[in-house]
Curated annotation (Swiss-Prot):
Residues 26-46 bind DNA. The gene is lexA. Its EC number is 3.4.21.88. The record marks A124, G125 as: Cleavage. It comes from the Bacteria. GO terms for biological process: DNA repair; DNA replication; negative regulation of DNA-templated transcription; proteolysis; SOS response. One of its GO terms (molecular function) is serine-type endopeptidase activity. CDD domains: S24_LexA-like (cd06529). SUPFAM superfamilies: LexA/Signal peptidase, Winged helix' DNA-binding domain. InterPro entries: LexA, LexA-like, LexA/Signal_pep-like_sf, LexA_DNA-bd_dom, LexA_repressor, Peptidase_S24_LexA, Peptidase_S24_S26A/B/C, WH-like_DNA-bd_sf. This is LexA repressor. HAMAP family: LexA. Homodimer. The active site is at S159 (for autocatalytic cleavage activity), K197 (for autocatalytic cleavage activity). It comes from Rhizobium etli (strain CIAT 652).
């Protein structure tokens, strides 16, 4: 299965070659997918080549050949510029709604509770492709939130269990792009993978640290990681 960004790049190359017969340049691909650097395009092309969707033709500049398209190909699915928050496991292969999280809405109980949008499932484990999908709303105590915009994510995975975050929990996230060392954040890696990890700095690099010794800390250059919000609360259902 392709990630959202891999599929967007493949379809962008396919549509450009249909129009002009020439593959787009790396700069054009970077701009179309709203990536920070061309290194992200190189990684996506390598992944597509390894999966058998494209082929690089030797001894020719900008020489790419599309071998096949995804089974769920839709001509209306085009690269989109920016999305927030970035979450996982929603409607992969379908055009997502591109709506930012709304401010939490008070409900009719004297203002003691508010409704927060649940934007999908976040990986507390190996990062999965980042897409946006507002699935439903959840009611939380108003004093859990404070100021700012908030959204909720359902946790998938066990990499944060030592921080008390378990598979199936719902985390409440304050939307934002900054974090302090030690904060648990929603991090977007290479504009295509979203994960829930503890934020650290290692010199000029960013470390995404799990709270489970079975998972390694992942180190990235600062241009590869975007903070999408900080953990402010957690909800657990007992069955």
């Amino acid at each position: 299965m392709l990630t959202r960004k891999q599929q967007e790049l493949l379809l962008f190359i396919h549509e450009r070659m249909k129009e002009s017969g020439v593959p787009p340049s790396f700069d054009e691909m970077k701009d179309a997918l709203d990536l920070a650097s061309k290194s992200g395009i190189h990684r996506l092309i390598t992944a597509l080549e390894e999966r058998g969707f494209i082929r690089r033709l030797p001894n020719r500049a900008r020489a790419l050949e599309v071998i096949k398209l995804p089974e769920a190909y839709s001509p209306s699915l085009q690269p989109r510029r920016g999305f927030s928050p970035s979450v996982i496991e929603g409607s992969l292969g379908k055009p997502p709604a591109v709506a930012a999280p709304a401010a939490a809405k008070p409900i009719a109980d004297n203002g003691n509770s508010v409704s927060v949008p649940v934007m999908g499932r976040i990986a507390a484990g190996v990062p999965i492709s980042a897409i946006q999908n507002n699935t439903h709303d959840i009611v939380v105590p108003a004093d859990m939130l404070g100021s700012g915009e908030h959204y909720a994510l359902e946790v998938k995975g066990d990499s944060m269990i030592d921080a008390g975050i378990f598979d199936g929990d719902t985390v409440i996230i304050r939307n934002g792009s900054t974090a302090s060392p030690g904060d648990i954040v929603v991090a977007l890696v290479d504009d295509e993978e979203a994960t829930l990890k503890r934020f650290r700095r290692k010199g000029a690099s960013i470390a995404l640290e799990a709270a489970n010794p079975a998972y390694e800390t992942r180190i990235f250059g600062p241009d590869r990681v975007k903070v999408q919000g900080k953990l402010v609360g957690l909800i657990r259902r007992y069955h």
